[in-house]
């Protein structure tokens, strides 16, 4: 339990730093749309799909190393990198500014693009191992 907690903490710290860096890097691109969080959630979905396929195809899914990889990268890094709470706050901010259609579009793009990314990531890696 202690090692897994440490792995989650290390992964989460790096994931949060990566999210911060991406949101800062994209802040000047769009003042209206929270592009950084949108990209974090899409990229995170792509990576989690790739990780799922990788763990299945490399047969690491049932081995001890799989547990460590999942806790470090999936629970830790991707947990710190992606964020539903920031996504929700971004939507609230858009609604409070009266930007209802932008908020609806942001919700639709976020959910659909993230779903497409997780499917794409999964099948990209599955294709590599076939």
Swiss-Prot record:
GO terms for cellular component: plasma membrane. It catalyses: fluoride(in) = fluoride(out). The chain crosses the membrane at residues 2-22, 36-56, 71-91, 100-120. Na(+) binds at residues 79, 82. Disulfide bonds: none annotated. Its main location: membrane. Keywords: Cell inner membrane, Cell membrane, Ion channel, Ion transport, Membrane, Metal-binding, Sodium, Transmembrane, Transmembrane helix, Transport. One of its GO terms (molecular function) is fluoride channel activity. GO terms for biological process: cellular detoxification of fluoride. Na(+) is not transported, but it plays an essential structural role and its presence is essential for fluoride channel function. Pfam families: CRCB. It is a multi-pass membrane protein. Fluoride-specific ion channel. Important for reducing fluoride concentration in the cell, thus reducing its toxicity. Belongs to the fluoride channel Fluc/FEX (TC 1.A.43) family. HAMAP family: FluC. This is Fluoride-specific ion channel FluC. It comes from Francisella tularensis subsp. tularensis (strain SCHU S4 / Schu 4).
